[in-house]
């Protein structure tokens, strides 16, 4: 079980809604993933009350919606988007994203912290997308964020846990859930994050652009389950030198045989 704010999740796979070929395919993949928390960009939602091709299927699916502020370049823009989401969708949960750099989509740490402090004071459950910076993650935690979401690699890059060393520190120090977000491109990456001690991962591109998104969603679901089981079982410590599982020295000395 994973507890974030007032909600308990049985799935540790969080998913996104972008890049799917069709809304139907998106819905099928999300169902196959078993995800209970789905993020969506407010800029892609029809707030005029029409038949929204993204929002309506998600509401039918019964998952918790996590509107994000993707597209915001400043704290002020992100706060405005979060307030709009709360008014339109009736949720006080928000994934805080502020990335003014359009090439690498790296989060702005200063604006992110500034927006987080404002939104927490307004009663939002804030899950900030941020760089894998242990100091920043601790500051976001102290500001009242319900979780932190450090990147594994740039958004959509599918490059895996390029920030592994820093993720280890973040996980070690965190007193709130750590959700590895961005860069996870294969089920093995998600498994690695769980073995590191992450509480969950968020995956979008790797599922949406797969040749078979539904099967890929199932693969990620199984990887997360395997990673959690492995962590609960207790992974063996790594060794620099070889350690034989069945020492043969005594056995050979007792035989007394020579060639």
From Swiss-Prot:
Binding residue positions for 1-deoxy-D-xylulose 5-phosphate: 156, 182-183, 204-205
Residues the record marks as active site: 95 (schiff-base intermediate with dxp)
UniProt EC number: 2.8.1.10
InterPro entries noted in UniProt: Aldolase_TIM, Thiazole_synthase_ThiG, ThiG
Location relative to the cell: Cytoplasm
Main location: cytoplasm
GO BP of this protein: thiamine diphosphate biosynthetic process
GO CC annotation terms, alphabetical: cytoplasm
Keywords: Cytoplasm, Schiff base, Thiamine biosynthesis, Transferase
Subunit structure: Homotetramer. Forms heterodimers with either ThiH or ThiS.
Sequence similarity: Belongs to the ThiG family.
Known role: Catalyzes the rearrangement of 1-deoxy-D-xylulose 5-phosphate (DXP) to produce the thiazole phosphate moiety of thiamine. Sulfur is provided by the thiocarboxylate moiety of the carrier protein ThiS. In vitro, sulfur can be provided by H(2)S.
Protein name: Thiazole synthase
Origin species: Serratia proteamaculans (strain 568)
Gene behind the chain: thiG
């Amino acid at each position: 079980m994973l507890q974030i704010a007032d909600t308990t999740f049985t799935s540790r796979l969080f998913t996104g809604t972008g890049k799917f070929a069709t809304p139907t395919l998106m819905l099928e993949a999300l169902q196959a993933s078993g995800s209970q928390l789905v993020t969506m960009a407010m800029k892609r939602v029809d707030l005029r009350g029409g038949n929204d091709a993204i929002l309506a299927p998600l509401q039918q699916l019964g998952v918790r919606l996590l509107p994000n502020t993707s597209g915001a370049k400043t704290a002020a823009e992100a706060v405005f988007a979060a307030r709009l989401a709360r008014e339109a969708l009736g949720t006080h949960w928000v994934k805080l994203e502020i990335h003014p750099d359009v090439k690498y989509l790296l989060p702005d740490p200063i604006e992110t912290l500034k927006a987080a402090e404002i939104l927490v004071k307004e009663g939002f459950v804030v899950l900030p997308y941020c760089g894998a910076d242990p100091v920043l993650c601790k500051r976001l935690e102290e500001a009242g964020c319900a979780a932190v979401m450090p990147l594994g690699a740039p958004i959509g890059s599918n490059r895996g846990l390029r920030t592994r060393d820093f993720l280890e520190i973040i996980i070690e120090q965190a007193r709130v859930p750590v959700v590895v977000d961005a860069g996870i491109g294969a089920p093995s990456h998600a498994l690695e994050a769980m073995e590191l001690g992450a509480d969950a991962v968020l995956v979008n591109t790797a599922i949406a652009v797969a040749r078979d998104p539904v099967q890929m969603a199932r693969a990620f679901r199984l990887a997360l389950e395997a990673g959690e089981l492995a962590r609960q079982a207790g992974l063996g410590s790594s060794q620099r030198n070889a350690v034989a599982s069945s020492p043969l020295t005594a056995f050979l000395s007792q035989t007394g045989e020579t060639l």
